[in-house]
UniProtKB/Swiss-Prot annotation:
Entries under PROSITE patterns matching the protein: S1
Biased composition (Pro residues): 1504-1513
Basic and acidic residues bias (residue ranges): 77-89, 127-149
PANTHER family for this protein: TRANSCRIPTION ELONGATION FACTOR SPT6 (PTHR10145:SF6)
Chain positions of motif Nuclear localization signal: 26-42
Annotated GO MF terms: DNA binding; histone binding; nucleosome binding
Chain segments carrying region Disordered: 1-204, 1490-1521
Keyword terms, alphabetized: Nucleus, Transcription
Name this protein carries in UniProt: Suppressor of Ty 6 homolog
Subunit-structure text: Interacts with glp-1 and lin-12.
Upper lineage: Eukaryota, Metazoa, Ecdysozoa, Nematoda, Chromadorea
Amino acid sequence: MDFIDNQAEESDASTGRSDDDEPQSKKMKMAKDKLKKKKKVVASSDEDEDDEDDEEEGRKEMQGFIADEDDEEEDARSEKSDRSRRSEINDELDDEDLDLIDENLDRQGERKKNRVRLGDSSDEDEPIRRSNQDDDDLQSERGSDDGDKRRGHGGRGGGGYDSDSDRSEDDFIEDDGDAPRRHRKRHRGDEHIPEGAEDDARDVFGVEDFNFDEFYDDDDGEEGLEDEEEEIIEDDGEGGEIKIRRKRDTTKKTTLLESIEPSELERGFLSAADKKIMIEDAPERFQLRRTPVTEADDDELEREAQWIMKFAFEETTVTNQAAVDADGKLECLMNIDSSEIEDKRRAVVNAIKAVLHFIRVRSNSFEVPFIGFYRKESIDNLLTMNNLWIVYDYDEKYCHLSEKKRRLYDLMRRMREYQELSDDITAKRRPINEMDLIDINFAETLEQLTDIHANFQLLYGSLLEDMTKWEKERRAADGEETEYRAKFKSSIRNDKYQMCVENGIGELAGRFGLTAKQFAENLDWRKHDIDQDSAFPLEAAEEYICPAFIDRETVLNGAKFMLAKEISRQPLVRSRVRQEFRDNAHFWVKPTKKGRDTIDETHPLFNKRYIKNKPIRNLTDEEFLYYHKAKQDGLIDMVLMYESDEDQAANQFLVKKFLSDSIFRKDEYTDNVEQWNAVRDQCVNMAITEMLVPYMKEEVYNTILEEAKMAVAKKCKKEFASRIARSGYVPEKEKLDEEDEEHSARRRMMAICYSPVRDEASFGVMVDENGAIVDYLRMVHFTKRGHGGGNTGALKEESMELFKKFVQRRRPHAIALNIEDMECTRLKRDLEEAVAELYSQSKIFSQINVYLMDNELAKVYMRSNISIAENPDHPPTLRQAVSLARQLLDPIPEYAHLWNSDEDIFCLSLHPLQRDIDQEILAQLLNHELVNRVNEEGVDINKCAEFPHYTNMLQFTCGLGPRKATSLLKSIKANDNLIESRSKLVVGCKLGPKVFMNCAGFIRIDTRRVSDKTDAYVEVLDGSRVHPETYEWARKMAVDALEVDDSADPTAALQEIMETPERLRDLDLDAFADELNRQGFGEKKATLYDISSELSERYKDLRAPFVEPSGEALYDLLTRSGKEVKVGCKMLGTVQSVQYRKVERDTIDSMIPEHTEEDQYICPSCKIFTAADPQSVREHLLNAGRPGGCVGSACGIRVRLDNGMTAFCPNKFISSSHVDNPLTRVKLNQPYWFKVMAINKEKFSILLSCKSSDLKEDAPAERDDFWDQQQYDDDVAAMKKETTKKKDADTRVKRVIAHPNFHNVSYEAATKMLDEMDWSDCIIRPSANKESGLSVTWKICDRIYHNFFVKESAKDQVFSIGRTLSVGGEDFEDLDELIARFVLPMIQISHEITTHKYFFTQGTSEDTDQVETFVHEKRRELGRSPYVFSASYRQPCQFCISYMFDNSNRIRHEHFKISPRGIRFRQQNFDSLDRMMAWFKRHFNEPPPGIRSSLSYRPTGRTGPPPSAPYQQPPQQQYYR
């Protein structure tokens, strides 16, 4: 029985795998323990992960629950490490496989020199001797180790010996020509190999002796492996034969693959799994899905279609994801009448079902692009391409959910069978019924299924191991010998719930009136009445007292816990609490000290760092991921709670919603009922508040985090889609026609790239229509300015002359310039001027446009390994230019080029948070977009085989993938690197029918180029999007459009129609579609119209045309390298110049010069020029714009920001007072802080302010709607206080006192030092309050320190220590006397108390509840009334003794104080703790003096039930990190 069939799996992390999932190599099976011809049954558990969670939960629950028991050790468990797949593979390799490996390992020459010929199995001895001789020769060249490896690999074809010493005696005859013939006698499973598969495999892998047995073992392989034999036939010397059988040597032989790193095998697609994917006739992406595509019947497809409609297109998210989900919404359901919604919805469900039918029905196996292009009628314009991918992705989720449901169903069914048929009485307590199994089938989400499994694990988890043992024994009784290896883990012995079950506490829980399931069913309506017990709760509990539960309070607490636990695991209860929590949860945020220093104006959370009472439903897009990341980095503290501040103030907690409905309360008012109602309320309170709320907090947190991550992935996908959505530059047809014969009809693109390092040379490159490099240009001084000083202008002109000659010689159709920084705009103008000069001189036929282009992709390519491998001699900037030119030609091949084994595509910057999300999900979404665009454009398969930079496009073709594309290219290279027609994909490349159907329509054959290379017939339709399945319809349309006889040549008709496509307009395609429908082809109207469109223009580019970045897009590209500029942020800028407003000549007459007290006249415009008479000022104004004339009125300053952008600061934003001349406030070439007031990206305009009021002011209008102003003000006040305190500390006089205990530190620093010092140490430091005083600090226990003031007097100097030190009315001469007489006595008494065995170390005496719990624990542990010491936090040097003073279990708390003279207790003095305790033990029953005022006690036992707690207010919110 298969391992998976024997065990239902729940955990994703389960190690169990089915043999059906992946073929095992033969060597893998040989490496395992040999199997006898006996059936082996392996029981495993998928509950390991869940059990570990329960185990951890159990440990937490057991802390402080009941009396201690002896700890029981768990059995040591060890897991066998997985064997390396690399060492298990024994594949046949053809020459190209070996070449690929050697290329990766950089040993091409070595392999060629040491090539070994592998001998074939034969009856003749010559191949055997040759193979052995080759091995010996190889060993002599490489050494014995390599020789052994090569013989191990070739042993299948030769004699199979490892060395000469291993040969049998039968091998002594070598040269008589009658060598023994060896036959293997073994079980074979060839019936499982499809007919013709071996032939296909030989063609694909390029080897003649391909053997499936070397890749995959059949089902009987393991059973027959032990008995594998060799049969040796020899001549008996008398004309007869002797057959000798012997066990075949199964010693593991080292192969070539075993010497290769696994990563290299993966990169080369050389593993057994890769080979299987290549051979199997199914789309590669179907096989690579985490949950592979499986077969489904019609009923299953209907259920799945309804499920996808509900959860993919109708289900709402917890947070607001409307913006990122817009692309996936169903456009057909938008803006329609409510009366039509239901019909439209049903139509969409049918369309989804049709799509699933194409995907999951094995006879179809169609990928999304094929469905979108060639099955349009089935989706009837109801689903877009994005919708189709959503259906595909949700199909994977549905299959995953179905598999988990199946496994849990099987597990529960087996448990039910165990309950019914076994003799285990404990298993029958809670029988599994049919409804429990039905609930699994009705589960629609992973959350619901997890709830069911959690409940199952609680109730039956402890029985799993017993169940598997029973199943083993049952199989053994049926005659099946089993090998048993249990992987179930029973519930741990110290699990709190399980201990209650084992001690029979569940019977008391059953007397509470309702079971957990009945309680859950009562949530909607009162389906079950409460069965009231006649006994009082504590009286009922007395019946179940046992050694583990020693009193009735403990018994009752255990029963309450059991029922609460069961309630918390009920799926209906969880579902209700989950929905309440998701609908009403709020969160609070505040920055930590690190966050306040780190989060500045440019941080995404700057205006969201103080949040109060924000509902999680108000979170948008990826907002929560920013919070999560900031929390991980220690920048913020965050709280997630159900109740808002208003709810807490009104006492409206989550549990109260469940208690207010009186679901678990009896409507009677007797004392018995009231006590039981109180117990029931406590149960519900425990289930909701203590168990479900923490669980739901974590679940909701993870849910909204996943939604935020998915938002990032979708935004990355959208950004990526926008980058590949446009085509390359296509020159106008006139430009192509007017060229000479040498350059005609060929697109040529040029790109120039410069480095941000100005000393480096710039490079230009020309590529042809295939992206191949034609020529390149090196310009050393391209980035210099033409009007610079010295010889800069001449050097610039030298580079520009080289550019002109290059353009004149190569005649590019367009020129691209990389956007590196702000300099690109100037360099573009230089290029445009040079091109215009060439055109004006008639050196080129037409104007050549210069385009600025984003160079991010080009820079990624420049740094990639694949770029270095393709262009090893080119400098980095030239490699960047090559990529930029190819992008200008067509961006898609260049993006696909980076989708390689190095994953260079993920170096693109698509979103600031893209590194913080699951890269597998990101890769899946980006892959969808590339698949869409590649198939929309079509793939020229011959170009992929000829040019390496086009090769990667093939893997995105519908039906293919990286492995199948690699195999296909290998076949093409074996066919002279040319595919003349699509049909050759089947005939020559051996594509299976399903893969061919998927990819055929998207593979383009450039019929013009192919016709030039071959004399074979070339099908013109192979160069179109018309699918081969509809070629006959296309020919029929061509013949009908030309109105010729049906016997006419359809190929000629097609050629004529393509030259005159307007003749197709007269065709009645609707009638043609109706005729096809009548003939049984189905609805094909959309297909016919697509064929007509394709005949009019083959493979018309459906992408948007190329455009140069401009406006906001160009602004973002130019500013991406520097600090992000946002409105409200503060930036450093340098004043470059003063901006003047020109003098309007019409206004000169109205301008009146200002007259000063010095009898001078000032120009009213510039406010700078002065003259002795008004006429001179007028002449100054009239000469405006000329040398010496008026420059105009100053209106502001030009500022250069850190990111290279130029901004403007008007006069009104320079200062709060009026400014005529900005230079009176600022200086040129000096840096100042500015605040960004406004940004206009279209005009490249940034408005600044340097007014002090603007720099100090935040931007409250931009803050979050739930901004916590109070917390913000408190933090600002605290920061100011801390700053003031630090200033005061810095100004405090440093004392110079020569004593080992003296330190110039603060109180906080002193406490930290004491934590690292011995218990007997103390620290003397300067007093923070008085100059003539000291402070002494010493440690009592953790977090409690005693600090007191020492007055100094009779000081000689201000800095010296006083000759008299006074504390509490006592005088001391020096510090040593102070420490010896005053400090050390208190430290010693304190140490005696804090190291006592009954000292409470978990808290302080103020923590009364914790102290009392500790007293009870000590009583159970010791069996008598104990006493406990605790220290006071609020009053250092004061301690408390807590003890039970009578049989009523009441606890009394008495305080005592220590001093240098001893201990003061009950108004008496004791010189040691021992003397105090001796007196206390004799008088503890006596009431202490002043009991009413100075003593406190609290009852802990009563005759009635524990105090009623229908709900508990949670503790005040505490920020956690």
